[in-house]
Amino acid sequence: PQMDQYAEQLAQKKEWDVIRIGFGRSDRRKGGKCVMLPSVEKFLGLFCSAACVLTDSFHATAFSLNLGTDFISVLPGRFGTRIESILKLTGTENRLLTRYDDFEVVDKVIDKKRVKEMLEKKRTEDIQWLMQALNV
C-alpha cells in the first residue's frame, strides 16, 4: 500500500500517468491503469516508453537498466540483496528509495553511459568464466 500511494503521489507531482503491469485480479483494484498479462512486445514497450519505472522487482530494475529507462527501486521484504547488488554494480544506488516521503530520488541523475559500460564489462567477464568452466 505504501508503494502504491507513493506511485500515485509521484505521478501527481510529475504529471505522469500510473500504468501497472498486472498478473492477477487484485492488481486491477489498485489505482492507475492496469495492463493485464501483456505480451512480451507490450511488456518491453511499457518499459521503453516509461518516464520512470517504480518497482520492488529485481527483474524490473534490470530491464530498466538494460533499456536505459529511469527507475526507482524499492527493496522488497525478500530478495532485496539482488537489487542492492545490481545497483552497486551499475553505480545507481542513488535510485534506491528508502523513505516514502522522498520525492527527490526521481531527479537524481543516472549515468547511463557508465551503466551500459558496467553491464557490458560484467557480461564479458561472465561469458569468459562460463567458457572456461565448460572448457570451450
PLM region spans:
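Active-site anion-handling motifs in enzyme catalytic cores
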Residues: 1-136
